[in-house]
Amino acid sequence: MNKIYLCAGNKGGTGKSMLATALIDAFLQRGVEPLLIETDDANPDVFKAHSERVQCAALSLDEADGWIEMVNSLDKTRGVPVVVNTAARNSTGVARYGQTLKSTLGELGRTMVTLWVINRQRDSLELLADYLDAMPAGADHQVHVVRNGYFGSAEKFQLYNGSQLKQRIEEAGGLTLDFPDLADRVADQMATQRLTIQGAFKEMPLGHRAELIRWRDEAFKVLGQVMT
């Protein structure tokens, strides 16, 4: 339970925040309270939804100071899993300062897991290739690709499915995961009211709750593959 989970994608609208929300909930279902580090200062919905439920920190990874503060936060919370919700524009910060984090993983006694959320567009893959150049996979860093079911079934991700990038990820020990789609009316209410999954069960009508339970169970199974 000493891992850092980066919910990444380097572009807006791929589903990073929903993935982070599901990952936090999956830890809570296991009786483990993670630390949330929110780096999306333009749209900190995950932070605002969870700030009263789990430990939270809000940082900007556009500058060196944010990376320094993140390492210090990780040092203070050893033994606690960490969920990092990344901002859409963080590729420049990763390229410049990512080694600040990566170089300290050994001393922190932590490993890093990147969950890279993709849609069906080419730039998702191009940004992933750039990320792998800046933060290569290795013994201390696993990279998994998450096909977001909101954009269609796994078979529709043709660019990724037939890519050398997929082969590169899987040869390095990474997985290709299929994150379930949540009905729009349920997802929209969660986003609008900034609800946690547990909070949504208290606020939503029965039909919404039934759909949320279905999605939550599927998400838990998918994320369980990387929560070791």
List each language-model region with its residue ranges.
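Conserved catalytic-core segment of NTP-binding enzymes
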Residues: 89-181, 185-187
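NTP-binding/hydrolysis catalytic cores, primarily Walker-type P-loop NTPases
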Residues: 189-228
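A short, charged/proline- and glycine-enriched loop
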Residues: 1-3, 110-111
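Nucleotide-state-sensitive switch-loop elements of NTP-binding domains
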Residues: 2-6, 20, 29-97
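Residue-level signal for alpha-helix termini/capping positions
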Residues: 28, 75-76, 106, 136
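Walker A (P-loop) phosphate-binding loop of P-loop NTPases
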Residues: 12-13
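Conserved lysine of the Walker
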Residues: 16
